[in-house]
Amino acid sequence: MKQSRTKRVLAIGELKFATNTLKRLSEKYHFEFIVPDPHDRSKTIEKIHEAASKSTFDACFWLFRNAAISPFTEEMLGPLLPTCKLFVTGAAGYNNVDVDWATRNGVYVANTPNGPTEGTANMNLMLFMCTLRGAREAEQSLRLGKWRQNLSLTDDPYGKRVGIIGMGAIGKSFAQKILPLGCEIVYHNRNRLEAEEEKRLGASFVSFDELLSSSDVISINCPLTPATHDLISTKEFEKMKDGVYIINTARGAIINEDAFIKAIKSGKVARAGLDVFLNEPTPNKFWLECDKVTIQPHCGVYTNFTVAKTEECVLASIETFLDTGIPTNPVNGPFGMNGC
């Protein structure tokens, strides 16, 4: 009987925590790792092409800290076809992956929506509190030697109506964290949650317009898709309360940047907390200089727990696909075992 070929996986990046799982899977599959160049996308492309020229691969995955080498397109991944039938991204968002190209070629794209949940939701909570309490302004005042000079009274979360746009895993986790703080939680989502889950989260479903017009705090927790690009722009800001607070840990392009900056300058938005920006890793200087905005360098997932869980999710998706032909959490397909 002819012995079957050992299935091969190309890994872009290095695993830090899931070493035991990798050791177990390495008994069934062959893993080849390449280290991406964090400063030069073209060099990473060269490494992938070189690996593809020497061997065939059945699946490919990449991990965190990939902003410098994205997007993941035909230019980068094309040589892995036609044998490679799965790309797994170690993130919940997949807007930097050319899913349409992959779909045309019968290649699954899978994300890891549960891996980043806690880290991102905790970042959301941190920015929520910092924004309400004006932490950036207070810290800057102290660092300049101006002890409490010109500081205004800030807000507590109790009694605030918090509107969550996007009630997926991250939105739900954030809702659970703020419910004990005495917040009134409303949400808008593509699909309404079941009544029991709404009760568990203490969240009420409202229309998009009602969320905009009635919320004291608006939290962006939806994925970036063609439908959510510039979801919040001039007319949406006009519907909001004066002095609203904005939190965004999803993607920068969900909020139109020009309209956002105008809303902050005018006072329509009192303060904001941002972990994501339109242009990464070089955001608009306004965000770096404005005392009314608490900022982070898209690092919500940069915790030991989150990275470890995401690595396990990536490997679980790889194993499921190589064993069954269908990955965990595909965002396209379905395809047959051999693609289209």
Curated annotation (Swiss-Prot):
Binding site for NAD(+): A169, I170, T249, A250, R251, D275, H298, C299, G300, V301
SUPFAM superfamilies linked to this entry: Formate/glycerate dehydrogenase catalytic domain-like, NAD(P)-binding Rossmann-fold domains
Keyword Hydrolase: no
Entry EC number(s): 1.-.-.-
GO MF annotation terms: glyoxylate reductase (NADPH) activity; hydroxypyruvate reductase [NAD(P)H] activity; NAD binding
GO terms of biological process kind: generation of precursor metabolites and energy; glyoxylate catabolic process
Segments traversing the membrane: none
Active site: R251, E280, H298
Top-rank EC class of the record's enzyme: oxidoreductase
Protein name, entry field: Putative 2-hydroxyacid dehydrogenase C1773.17c
Organism the protein comes from: Schizosaccharomyces pombe (strain 972 / ATCC 24843)
